[in-house]
């Protein structure tokens, strides 16, 4: 029995499903999860000593690669001063100033510990600011596991849930909780216009992933985001970009910089923690002024602005500002997508890929999807076989057909070429 299997059997005795986040259990693809012991650069090693090229990157944070010496040094130095204070620090100010500098739509920012906290708090703040209750979200967009957002959500919920009904995607969420959440089709401008026409003066906020990364990778059209911006401005609703995944990943200023569209509020996570638990939400000063202790919208957190997380995140944010960083990252990610597409074509496999910044999506379909409905038409069985063939070749992809992949600054030409060569074998194997 492999060491991975031994650990999985042991884990299931004390941890539900043997994992602390559902997608890690390999339930979608089958087989035994890999228990990781260490990682460096673009590689990680499992409990059986197998090395993998890593295209998960901790689901996005590891943009500069695993165990970057500057990040490690910053965390080590901070740890000697204590792990947490429960009081303000100068480093928190440095972090806030860096975020506001890099994302101009954010005039003020509040640090939290997870993406779910960021989106949940942003929506509460939007409701408090507008005095309205109704929220619009989109099919397949995952905004964390707050009850009001678990309706036709992406990420692990897309893998496990029945998404055919406009009902909570998770057991334990009362329908009453989600009745103030309206779910529309991603990239459907007409639906969005109709929703605002029917609910004038009722919509507190629209929350969207400007590049969806939790139903695989699906880009928002420029027309869709522009209509969203215009409608929110016209009706006094708060436009929230959930950039937990895309922030500092699609571009230095996030997806909003890529599209040139300015939201009222932004949620950040993943990259801003450099691998540590950290997230943030921020935006217009007049909206943020409603947040406690200034205003009546409450939000708090014992470990918000944790010194170790801030040290890792701030160091990462400074590293990614190096000249040419994003040009190189986008080039490598595009090389990967194009190489995989070429290998599939040569093997006669229906397949396509897309890439934006340091994110990519692979689809066992003939065309890149533009909506939740199109994503669900992908050949999941074929993806599962491909996943295991790649794993056997030492390439670690997301263990679900409905998750985006991530490239780091450490994925050089040799690593991309090795990945494409492994894929060529996997495609030919069927």
Curated annotation (Swiss-Prot):
Its cofactor is pyridoxal 5'-phosphate. One of its GO terms (biological process) is protoporphyrinogen IX biosynthetic process. Its main location: cytoplasm. It comes from the Bacteria. One of its GO terms (cellular component) is cytoplasm. The modification N6-(pyridoxal phosphate)lysine is found at residue 270. It holds the Pfam family Aminotran_3. It is found in: Cytoplasm. It catalyses: (S)-4-amino-5-oxopentanoate = 5-aminolevulinate. Keywords: Cytoplasm, Isomerase, Porphyrin biosynthesis, Pyridoxal phosphate. Transmembrane segments: none annotated. Its EC number is 5.4.3.8. It is an enzyme of class 5 (isomerase). Gene3D superfamilies: Aspartate Aminotransferase, domain 1 (3.90.1150.10), Type I PLP-dependent aspartate aminotransferase-like (Major domain) (3.40.640.10). One of its GO terms (molecular function) is transaminase activity. Pathway: Porphyrin-containing compound metabolism; protoporphyrin-IX biosynthesis; 5-aminolevulinate from L-glutamyl-tRNA(Glu): step 2/2. Homodimer. Belongs to the class-III pyridoxal-phosphate-dependent aminotransferase family. HemL subfamily. This is Glutamate-1-semialdehyde 2,1-aminomutase. The lineage of its organism: Bacteria, Pseudomonadati, Pseudomonadota, Betaproteobacteria, Burkholderiales.
């Amino acid at each position: 029995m492999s060491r991975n299997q031994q650990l999985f059997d042991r884990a299931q005795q004390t941890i539900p499903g043997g994992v602390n986040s559902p997608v890690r259990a390999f339930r979608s693809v089958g087989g035994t999860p890999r228990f990781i012991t260490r990682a460096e650069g673009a590689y990680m090693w499992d409990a059986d000593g197998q090395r993998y090229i890593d295209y998960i990157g901790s689901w996005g944070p590891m943009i500069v690669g695993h165990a970057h010496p500057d990040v490690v040094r910053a965390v080590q130095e901070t740890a000697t001063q204590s792990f947490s204070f429960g009081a303000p620090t100068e480093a928190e100010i440095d972090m806030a100033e860096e975020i506001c500098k890099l994302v101009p739509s954010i005039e003020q920012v509040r640090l939290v510990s997870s993406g779910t906290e960021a989106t949940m708090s942003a929506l509460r703040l939007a409701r408090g600011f507008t005095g309205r209750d109704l929220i619009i979200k989109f099919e397949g967009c995952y905004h964390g596991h707050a009850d009001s957002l678990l309706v036709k959500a992406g990420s692990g919920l897309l893998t496990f849930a029945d998404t055919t009904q406009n009902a909570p995607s998770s057991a334990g969420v009362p329908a009453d909780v989600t009745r103030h959440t309206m779910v529309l089709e991603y990239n459907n401008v007409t639906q969005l216009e109709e929703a605002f026409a029917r609910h004038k003066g009722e919509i507190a906020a629209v929350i969207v992933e400007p590049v969806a990364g939790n139903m695989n990778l699906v880009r928002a059209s420029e027309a869709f985001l522009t209509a969203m911006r215009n409608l929110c401005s016209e009706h006094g609703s708060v436009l929230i970009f959930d950039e937990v995944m895309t922030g500092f990943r699609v571009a230095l200023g996030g997806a909003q910089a890529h599209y040139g569209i300015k939201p009222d509020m932004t949620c950040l996570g993943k990259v801003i923690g450099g691998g540590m638990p950290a997230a943030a939400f921020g935006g217009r000063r007049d909206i943020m002024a409603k947040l406690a202790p200034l205003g009546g919208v409450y939000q708090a957190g014992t470990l918000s602005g944790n010194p170790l997380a801030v040290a890792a995140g701030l160091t990462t944010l400074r590293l990614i500002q190096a000249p040419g960083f994003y040009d190189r990252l986008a080039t490598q990610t595009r090389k990967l997508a194009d190489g995989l597409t070429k290998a599939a074509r040569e093997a006669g496999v229906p397949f396509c890929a897309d890439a934006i910044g340091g994110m990519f999506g692979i689809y066992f379909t003939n065309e890149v999807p533009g909506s939740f409905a199109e994503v669900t038409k992908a050949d999941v069985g074929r993806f599962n076989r491909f996943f295991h063939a790649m794993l056997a070749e030492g390439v670690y992809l997301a263990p679900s057909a409905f998750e985006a992949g991530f490239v780091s600054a450490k994925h050089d030409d040799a690593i991309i070429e090795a990945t494409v060569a492994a894929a060529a074998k996997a495609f030919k194997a069927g």
